[in-house]
């Protein structure tokens, strides 16, 4: 069956918009920034779309949320951090599945690793690029970790539904 580039582009745009919306529905972090369910949608989109296209689509959604939500200073970092997260989730999932491991386990490990990338990425970005310093950046680590745990729970539990409707096979 030939893959439809139009359908893939449409689903990529949909996930971009969904990541943006889920990210904008946020609650403020105790020191700087915010936490949201955008990462859960980001992981879903990354695994559904796959490859560099999927990573770019979901990372753009997160960056657009920063621009719209008043966190423009975070936008460049978010683009790079979320791109690294998505690529980590996609590539590690693909690697683990090559060993014929259960998909849920692969997503759990890949999602956890991607969220560690997010936590480390935002710590470095806040501490050194935004010049908040390591102490202020470290204060957000528990909040980012909570966001990561929620993202893993959402993405790992919802992905079987995405798979069941056949969206992954049709792209």
Regions found by a protein language model. Name each.
Residues 1-171:
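Loop-helix junctions at membrane interfaces
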């Amino acid at each position: 069956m030939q893959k439809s580039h139009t359908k893939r582009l449409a689903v990529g745009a949909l996930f971009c918009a969904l990541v943006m919306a889920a990210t904008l529905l946020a609650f403020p972090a105790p020191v700087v920034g915010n936490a949201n369910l955008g990462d859960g949608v980001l992981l879903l989109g990354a695994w559904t779309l796959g490859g560099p296209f999927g990573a770019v689509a979901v990372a753009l959604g997160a960056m657009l949320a920063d621009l719209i939500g008043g966190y423009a200073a975070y936008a460049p970092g978010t683009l790079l951090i979320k791109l690294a997260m998505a690529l980590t989730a996609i590539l590690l999932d693909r690697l683990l599945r090559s060993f014929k491991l259960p998909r849920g386990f692969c997503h759990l490990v890949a999602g956890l690793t991607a969220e560690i990338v997010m936590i480390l990425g935002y710590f470095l970005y806040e501490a050194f690029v935004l010049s908040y310093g390591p102490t202020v950046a470290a204060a957000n680590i528990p909040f980012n970790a909570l966001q990561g745990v929620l993202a893993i729970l959402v993405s790992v539990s919802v992905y079987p539904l995405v798979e069941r409707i056949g969206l992954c096979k049709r792209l």
